[in-house]
Amino acid sequence: MASSEAPPALASGPVAWIRENLFSSIPNTVLTLLALYVIYVIVPPLVQFAFVDAVWSGTDRTACATEQQGGVQPNGWFGACWAYVGVYGEQFIYGRYPDEELWRVDIVGLLFFGALIPLLIPSAPFKRENIIFISVVFPVVALVLLTGGHFELNGFMPTGFLFEPGMVKFWVDYLILSAIVVGIAYAIARASDKDPMPGMRGAAIFMVGIAIIMAIFAVDFGLEHVPTDRWGGLLVTMVIAVTGIAVSLPIGIVLALGRRSHMPIVRFFSVVFIEFWRGVPLITVLFMSSVMLPLFLPEGVTFDKLLRALVGVAMFASAYMAEVVRGGLQAIPKGQFEGAMALGLNYNQMMRMIVMPQALKLVIPGIVNTFIGLFKDTTLVLIIGLFDFLGQIQSSFTDPTWATPVQALSAYLFAAFVYFVFCFGMSRYSIFMERRLDTGHR
């Protein structure tokens, strides 16, 4: 008679998962115990500070100060001062934007997220309409609402000896610029032995579109003008991050293609652009754009400080994005290019329909990682006097009304939570898209 044996170990369920993933070997067991110890050391005090001992209401520093500090809390109390965050919450989001005009910022936010969310949902309809709205219509509407519109259009070319600064000079200069752009399109087409008409037509349509947008900016909509130096908080962070993300991806794609181009001039300028911006710290870029650039401009020509920061951040991010996209292009097998050419596709069709979709699919993690880094790098604009979300929080520390030992800790914890929500959201969506597009190779 066979001897009885113990039943086999549980092969499914939480106990089996814990045994397999956390205590499967001696090194895993040591790492698990070490992680549990770190969690025990960090999480309970954090929960105690942020929730259990936190102060949720109050009108001044006395609500978040101990009796020895002139407050109402017992000596030895140590908790978050969410009352202070609640009082300054509006300033953390809008900066010094006029209170009576905050509805304009709210509308811009609703329009942006209202168009972005359906665009991110794969099954949502009207994708093309959403893309057109968020890439063409929304920037115009947002700029008019946030600034008030009614921009003064002056000339930007050395034609002052013919016209006085004003609307007429601007449109004359714009016609000259349009002719130059169309001429460049013609020269590029001729150098590539292609029909110049499609390129010239596209350049002309593009310049006409820009002219329509500029005409809209010049219209007086009756809105109060709000200069960008009154913007701040999360508004500035979102403006810089969204602009940088929206601009860096298409420019990065063009630069990546240019660096792989067989035309020496295109490849040379693409390499120079990428290596220059990659070799300079972002702080230096912001400092140069804000302090040094105005010194090289003609007298009377100025650019808004926020605009200079937007250009610097966008160019900086574009260089890194170009290398991410180039990595995806290099990962595409040569057979994909040969198959596309065998089908009779030209270069543009091959890149648009065959190569680029596969390349972008492969580098989704790198693209989103660049976006996350760009979002966090917006905090550097404080060095040039722009008060982004973190800068606006730091500026509130000078208010003696809420000066307590826990003021800065509460504010930085709130800032960390906000940044985590945005960055974690981008990370999770990246994982979702990877799984949906099946970027793995079996």
In which residue ranges do the predicted regions lie?
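Transmembrane alpha-helices and adjacent helix-loop boundaries
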Residues: 2-442
